[in-house]
Amino acid sequence: MHDLVRFFINFLVVCIFCSNFAPLNSMKIDMMKSVRFIPLVLLCVLTACHSNTSSCSSASPVAEWNRATQILMHTPGEELFNGAINPLAALFEYYFDVDSAAIEHKNYIAMLEANGIEVMTVSEILQQAPIEALRDYVSNVLQYESDIDESDHLAVSDSYRRETIAQMSRNDLIRCILLQPTVRLTTTDINTGVEAQYLQSPLFNLYFTRDQSISTPKGQIICNMNSAQRSKETDLIAFCYEQMGVKPILRITGDGRLEGGDYIPAGTRAFIGCGMRTNIEGIEQIMRADGFGHDTVVVVKDRKWWQMQMHLDTYFNIIDRDLCTLVESRLHATDQDPEWVTVDVYTRAEDGISYRLDQADIPLVAYLQGIGFSIIPISEEDELHYANNYLTIAPRHIMAVANQSHTLVQAFEQHGVKVEWVPLENLIKGYGAAHCMTQVIRRKRM
């Protein structure tokens, strides 16, 4: 609404300086004469948009059912191995084969591209970035640790570290970014006089590109991850956006927590999960900054805090403006069950920018039905095979994990849903699927 106000203010201001603008009290314009006002109107629109580009962009994601046109992904590589050898510590469910996972991911990208979607990968962006930008990034990544005084040995000095970075090839710089190495140095009486332990904190969860940021109608917001294992991923995604020429509108800081799997845009509404990975402080930071760009913010409050349903998109998802899915344990829960989900509904205040609490503790199912959604239930069997974590690429057109039940296949068919079944048997062992592996940057509004 405030963009419309800005438009009319700009319109009147420009009119004052337009010499051929007729007085308002005697305006009588025929069709031919009105043509001369077209440039004036266009100027006002451009002026209004310039002050808030993202709010005027027709490509910014507004609804999950809008046609996806550009997606950011990351095909996992050698950084995944350390996570696979101790899955639980890496936030994974089971061990899985690293090479097979990469093949699955590339196949998924090919399926998306076959639908006319531009897929950009983190590796491609790093390969195209200026090499000095990579060196600057790596200077904050590669660490030398030692109790040795720098004056006692060249190998522990910061100048030696920087000299080494200055000689690195592009591929080795990218390895540093993905593996996050630390060299722990000690002295020895033999050979070069120094030895080391080589430690790594690889970005093994990076292939879940849904989580490090969210793409709202206003623009990109950099998240603040709930887990220490994933904290460095947001820096890399912010760097990728910079290389793409995208300036994020906000970064969540301090005690605020936000992960992208908790955000689902739905036209004039935003659904945002509040629970295991995203907290109310993170959500409030977005609302205070007017970062959502939706008139209504629906905070979905989860009290179960279960790893299998860590994000909103693991138990709720949207296929079209009037069709969604919900796992059966949430659909049939009572207020005595840990699976019971309620929502707080925030709406725009009178200033058109801030939000106010309009409704509190409304049962999620009742709210969804009240705004016109039909709900397809996801059985426990299908849920455990990540059936709910599909990606909607167009109205009633989804990319979903293959090998689901016949019952679910029939339910999709009965609701006119086109499903492309994606084989992801290795990748889903990392606790995520088709939705988690994609950050939809642009959608075409339908």
Model-derived regions: residue spans:
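Short, positively charged and aromatic/hydrophobic N-terminal segments
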Residues: 10, 16, 20-23, 28-31
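C-terminal motif of bacterial Sec signal peptides marking the signal peptidase cleavage site
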Residues: 47-48
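Sec-dependent signal peptide recognition
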Residues: 33-40
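The feature marks the mature, well-folded catalytic cores of soluble enzymes
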Residues: 54-446
